[in-house]
């Protein structure tokens, strides 16, 4: 149940904040990673603020719980001008699955990887969180099955 709660919460928050405004977005204004400060990878993500190989490996590992993966992404945070962590994660997934990023689609990815990609997209682009909705909905559907 806990595994599906965070993705559902994030999807609902995206629907609430999908219109671009200058008010704080619940996606970017809620630093829930603070509750996971005892997790080494969360600490690292907060300090680095950018996707690296170790963070990407952590997000793709089936051994790590989805709530901790979400906390890692939340700890990477966002910038008003945008970030490219989703793009960096896509490159990692291409290497992992031995595919070019143009060939990579969600059929090759786990539900957790799809969720991580969606949440990274939402965090990367403050003004267009709706771009993440299709991936988050797909991840949620796969997690329910």
Q: Which residues fall in each region the model found?
A:
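Positively charged n-region of N-terminal signal peptides that target proteins for export
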Residues: 1-4
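Residue signature of alpha-solenoid helical repeat architecture, marking inter-repeat boundaries
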Residues: 63-67, 108-115, 144-145
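Alpha-helix boundary/capping segments in eukaryotic regulatory proteins
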Residues: 107-110, 125-134
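Short secondary-structure subsegments characteristic of cysteine-rich extracellular domains
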Residues: 131-145
